[in-house]
């Protein structure tokens, strides 16, 4: 390497520059690199150094057997090459783009024809060079004088140009790199420009590389400086790139959180200080830190209220003067579980932010607190009549939900009455002033509640998680007066005194109010209960029912005047119209039915286009109209008003008829025993109420009189009612919705019939029970299969389960679940439960219990909140069925509702998942459910891998080991913390420990008194630092405790060793002094004994031995 300044050349007196005749034949040379490493980056770095080496080669050393241009051009090229080298350096700094231009092109102006000409001349010359076996030297063209002024060395250059080795360089025809040796040029072409299958080629500059890593490194030279900042050695693994800033991430969820920085979205909010976070990690750190201390549990975690019955719950007292005013729910995805909010905060809909009216109970005694997760008190809650419309609300603490949910007990009662009663749909909007415009759902009851009977709420459970992930609250609800609860079930045949209940006008979501039109005149009339949304229903399936289903999808389309759930599309409506049960709000229903029948009369078999037009004209969904036409064509719906207009028209069939018809129905389609029992149509004998309400005998003929079929799923295999089978139940009396009662042999031989209480709520003879009926499909079609089930139910076994889904934004009106494939509704707690879903309220009617369930009715009743702790932890109060089999015998796709894109959306927050299992695990965040429990210490975890790591604490397994210090870890988190934060200095600590141990061993041989003192400080410090890092790990608490105990034991042992060593040392020194002083042996022994009294017994023994030795010496 030349140490002196570059371009210091031998000067000649008479430089001649005008003899270069053909510049086109001259090939510019850049530089040479003797040590080519096959990498473009390294080649660039070596250009300058190689040029300096070549500059020192004297002219005399040049070979003589090669073709040489005239001497003048040789001298001219010497200085020119210097400037070319300088220009090359600047181009290297600028980047590869600048290198693409030939250096000579920057020098020549007028004397050089063009870049194209030079390139054209390169190829034949290079071919000629490649054919030669020796080195050819070519001298570049002479530069213009004024071009030199740009470089620093130019000022010091003499006019005399000097020939140098730069003129000897060979240029690559592909990339214009110069090489002094021909073999170097050949190698360069072979490794850089010769393409084959094994090489990796750059698409930008045609460079080839033997390894992909070389190509990746080379590609970074083409990136801009902004992009290169984010390029790392592991850039190949970062597949997810931000389109805004170009930053790349290894994982997609990291990119999602990063994008929130650009969008400004901050979905995580602290419930205490209201601070918002864009990253879940920041939110988690904030929650777990001690900075924001409020109502939140420690580290943001809380156990499920069902698991720990002693969880704190707010008192359910509400001020009678003011209604519960809901607050808008902020969108939080990972709030801490069981957040205790003020009583006036009510959970609103999370997804679409539509605000449903809050149910408000008038005059309800809400003073009793929740006990063991169940709202119960010494006396049941009573919804008494309150003409003043006093508004009180029961606020239930939700488990893992955003905020407590408010329940209006009186509205629940009214809606329940209306729902059970077929006349639900005849409701009129009267609370126009109570609107949703203010986003505060404040339902004001203007009309006084006329209630002769009392509604009793014996228990309100904490939220439960259904099999499909829906969170519900179960209310043990009884509509009878307390005196009537004593009635014996066998008194079924006696007419029930029907209390006159005019439901108060309640504002349902979408401004749909349900007003029970049950005037005292209509108390005795048949309930127009029909199968809601049930395709399997007989022809008298109420159009109302399907209309309800439609309303859930398109609530705004329903005219308010038609009633929230006017019975629209099906034939059942005519029966109701004939029975004068229709309220003024029902004429639209008549119009709809008359329109449908008119269309049917015109064309009994309309085409698809005509059906769509008909559906648009009647404002009903196409599938509903299509089904109605199909049933009309099948004869299941009579063209005339299918229901008898008067009680006299009711057809009465004998019990044998019922049996035969039930048998045919069973043969036609297998049924769940639960469905059979719950099918209102199967009601054996119900008495006509005092009002003389009639029951429709043939369900097919009279759609409205048939009781509501509340079967929750098509899987439960409810009846597909044919015209013949539908008529199984000629019922002379209104449906008795109380518990199914044994009617002698009739019930024993017939399919289990669920006797629902009269729609007017006649006195129930038994208290309602919250036992959950377990799904048990009926394997035999014979009626006798249901016989054992009939007798299974204890007097109080027939509960009305009121399941209140905490979030049912998609359910604007009362909805009965019929088919889980088509109906986007919540399911009952057990798949066979018959359920009505009302905005924020789902009523589950369980009329019979399968034999498997009868053994554990108390537990199921307690499942509402006070159930046995073990069962709650496993099933979270959903049902025993889910505990036995997560798949729940239904296809997985039916368990979770899919969105349009096939994704699984959480109904408690806005998150969407690709797999149902991911959604199920996500639900644990809301519910606090921890399904994976340690069998040793009973600690539960949300994720299985957390349990696996926890089990290592018990087994002592430590699979993770630091390769530096050799320390082992049982948790991957502890190992990760160590590797991220302590790996840089953990080896030094290990060496220090080793050195101290060696010192300790050596000093034990010589003097062991100082070794322990030196070893302990480093050990203590390392252990303290280690414990600090491990505190961040949630599942390593036990490990920390064990290590701390070991540390304490070690310190105690060290202290004891020090004491022993100090005692021994003092004894030796004093004994020597005593020997010198000639003290007596007795004095020595006394001193030794006195000092040994403060030490261990071993020390005393050793002291005694020492004293004996000294005595011998003396």
Swiss-Prot record:
Residue ranges crossing the lipid bilayer per the database entry: none
Disulfide bonds: none
DNA-binding region residue numbers: 581-640
Protein location: Nucleus
CC terms in the record's Gene Ontology section: nucleus
Motif (CTBP-binding motif): 767-771
Compositional bias annotation for Low complexity: 15-30, 309-326, 682-716
Expression sites by tissue: Expression is developmentally regulated with high expression in mesoderm, nervous system and lens.
SUPFAM superfamilies xrefs: beta-beta-alpha zinc fingers (SSF57667), Homeodomain-like (SSF46689)
Keywords recorded for this protein, A-Z: DNA-binding, Homeobox, Metal-binding, Nucleus, Repeat, Transcription, Transcription regulation, Zinc, Zinc-finger
Location of the region described as Disordered in the Swiss-Prot/TrEMBL record: 1-105, 142-163, 304-326, 491-529, 553-588, 636-716, 852-898, 989-1114
PROSITE patterns assigned to the protein according to its UniProt record, in alphabetical order: ZINC_FINGER_C2H2_1, ZINC_FINGER_C2H2_2
Family designation: Belongs to the delta-EF1/ZFH-1 C2H2-type zinc-finger family.
Protein name: Zinc finger E-box-binding homeobox 1
Record organism: Gallus gallus (Chicken)
């Amino acid at each position: 390497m030349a140490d002196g300044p570059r371009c210091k050349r031998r000067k000649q007196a008479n430089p001649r520059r005008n003899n270069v005749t053909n510049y086109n034949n001259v090939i510019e040379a850049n530089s040479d690199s003797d040590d080519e490493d096959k990498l473009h980056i390294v080649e660039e770095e070596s250009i300058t150094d190689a040029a300096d080496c070549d500059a020192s080669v004297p002219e005399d050393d040049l070979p003589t057997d090669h073709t040489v241009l005239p001497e003048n051009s040789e001298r001219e090229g010497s200085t020119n090459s210097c400037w070319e080298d300088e220009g090359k350096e600047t181009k290297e700094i600028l980047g590869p783009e600048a290198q693409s231009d030939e250096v000579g092109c920057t020098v020549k102006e007028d004397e050089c024809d063009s870049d194209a000409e030079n390139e054209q001349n390169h190829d034949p010359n290079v071919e000629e060079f490649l054919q030669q076996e020796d080195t050819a030297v070519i001298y570049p063209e002479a530069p213009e004088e004024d071009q030199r002024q740009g470089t620093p060395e130019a000022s010091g250059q003499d006019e005399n140009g000097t020939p140098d080795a730069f003129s000897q360089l060979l240029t690559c025809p592909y990339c214009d790199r110069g090489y002094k040796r021909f073999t170097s040029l050949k190698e360069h072409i072979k490794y850089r420009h010769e393409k084959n299958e094994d090489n990796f080629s750059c698409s930008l500059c045609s460079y080839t590389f033997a390894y992909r890593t070389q190509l990746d490194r080379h590609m970074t030279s083409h990136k801009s400086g902004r992009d290169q900042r984010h390029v790392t050695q592991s850039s190949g693994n970062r597949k997810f790139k931000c389109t805004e800033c170009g930053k790349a991430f290894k994982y997609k969820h990291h990119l999602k959180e990063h994008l929130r920085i650009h969008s400004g979205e901050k979905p995580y909010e602290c419930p205490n200080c209201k601070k918002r976070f864009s990253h879940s990690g920041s939110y988690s750190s904030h929650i777990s830190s001690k900075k924001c201390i409020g109502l939140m549990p420690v580290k943001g975690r809380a156990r499920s209220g069902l698991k720990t019955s002693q969880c704190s719950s707010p008192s359910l007292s509400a001020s009678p003067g003011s209604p519960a005013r809901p607050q808008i729910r902020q969108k939080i995805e990972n709030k801490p579980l069981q957040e205790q909010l003020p009583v006036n905060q009510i959970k609103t809909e999370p997804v679409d932010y539509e605000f449903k009216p809050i149910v408000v109970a008038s005059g309800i005694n809400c003073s009793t607190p929740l006990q063991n997760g169940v709202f119960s008190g010494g006396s049941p809650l009573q919804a008494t009549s309150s003409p003043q419309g006093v508004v009180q609300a029961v606020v239930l603490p939700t488990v893992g939900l955003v905020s407590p949910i408010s329940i209006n007990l009186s509205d629940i009662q009214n809606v329940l009455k209306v729902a059970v009663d077929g006349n639900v749909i005849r409701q009129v909007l009267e609370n126009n002033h109570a609107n949703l415009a203010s986003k505060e759902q404040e339902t004001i009851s203007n009309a006084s509640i006329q209630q002769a009977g009392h509604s009793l709420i014996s228990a309100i459970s904490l939220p439960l998680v259904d099999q499909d992930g829906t969170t519900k609250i179960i209310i043990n609800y009884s509509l009878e007066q307390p005196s009537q609860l004593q009635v014996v079930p066998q008194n079924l045949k006696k007419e029930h005194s029907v209390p006159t209940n005019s439901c108060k006008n309640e504002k349902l979501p979408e401004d749909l109010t349900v007003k029970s039109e049950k005037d005292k005149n209509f108390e005795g009339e048949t309930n127009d209960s029909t199968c809601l949304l049930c395709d399997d229903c007989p022809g008298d399936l109420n159009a109302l029912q399907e209309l309800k289903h439609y309303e859930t999808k398109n609530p705004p389309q329903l005219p308010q005047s038609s009633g929230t759930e006017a019975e629209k599309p099906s034939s059942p409506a005519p029966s109701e119209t004939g029975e004068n049960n229709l309220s003024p709000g029902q004429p639209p229903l008549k119009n709809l039915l008359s329109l449908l029948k008119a269309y049917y009369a015109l064309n009994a078999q309309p085409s698809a286009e005509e059906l769509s037009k008909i559906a648009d004209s009647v404002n009903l969904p196409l599938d509903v109209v299509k089904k109605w036409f199909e049933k009309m064509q099948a004869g299941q719906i009579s063209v005339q008003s299918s229901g008898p207009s008067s009680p006299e028209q009711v057809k009465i069939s004998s019990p044998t008829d019922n049996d035969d018809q039930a048998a045919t129905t069973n043969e036609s389609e297998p049924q769940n025993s639960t469905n059979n029992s719950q099918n209102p149509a199967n009601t054996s004998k119900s008495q006509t109420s005092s009002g003389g309400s009639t029951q429709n005998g043939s369900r097919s003929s009279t759609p409205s009189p048939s009781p509501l079929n509340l079967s929750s799923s098509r899987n439960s295999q409810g009846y597909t009612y044919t015209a013949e089978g539908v008529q199984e139940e000629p019922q002379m009396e209104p449906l008795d919705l109380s518990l199914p009662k044994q009617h002698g042999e009739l019930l024993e031989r017939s399919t289990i019939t669920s006797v629902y209480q009269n729609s007017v709520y006649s006195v129930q003879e038994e208290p309602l029970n919250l036992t959950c009926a377990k799904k048990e499909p009926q394997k035999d079609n014979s009626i006798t299969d249901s016989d054992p089930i009939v007798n299974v139910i204890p007097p109080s076994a027939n509960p009305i389960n009121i399941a209140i889904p905490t979030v049912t934004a998609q359910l604007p009106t009362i909805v009965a679940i019929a088919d889980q494939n088509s109906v986007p509704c919540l399911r009952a707690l057990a798949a066979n439960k018959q359920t009505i879903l009302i905005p924020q309220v789902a009523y589950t009617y369980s009329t019979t219990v399968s034999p498997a369930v009868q053994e554990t009715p108390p537990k199921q009743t307690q499942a509402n909140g006070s159930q046995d702790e073990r069962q709650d932890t496993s099933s979270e109060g959903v049902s025993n069925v889910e505990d036995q089999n997560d798949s729940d015998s239904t296809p997985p796709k039916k368990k979770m509702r899919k969105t349009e894109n096939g994704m699984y959306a959480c109904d408690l927050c806005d998150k969407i998942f690709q797999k149902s299992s991911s959604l199920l695990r996500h639900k644990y965040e809301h519910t606090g459910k921890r399904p994976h429990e340690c069998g040793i210490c009973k600690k539960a975890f949300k994720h299985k891998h957390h349990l696996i790591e926890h089990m290592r604490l018990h087994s002592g397994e430590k699979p993770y080991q630091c390769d530096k210090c050799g320390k082992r870890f049982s948790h991957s988190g502890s190992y990760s913390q160590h590797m991220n934060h302590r790996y840089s200095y953990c080896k030094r600590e290990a060496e220090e420990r080793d050195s101290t141990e060696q010192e300790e061993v050596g000093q034990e041989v010589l003097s062991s008194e100082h070794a322990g003192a030196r070893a302990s400080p480093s050990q203590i410090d390392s252990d303290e630092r280690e414990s600090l890092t491990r505190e961040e790990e949630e599942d390593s608490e036990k490990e920390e405790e064990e290590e701390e105990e070991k540390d304490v034991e070690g310190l105690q042992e060290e202290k004891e060793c020090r004491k022993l060593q100090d005692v021994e040392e003092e004894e030796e020194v004093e004994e020597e002094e005593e020997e010198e002083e000639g003290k007596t042996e007795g004095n020595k022994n006394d001193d030794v004994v006195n000092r040994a009294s403060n030490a261990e017994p071993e020390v005393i023994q050793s002291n005694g031995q020492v004293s004996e030795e000294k005595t011998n010496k003396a």
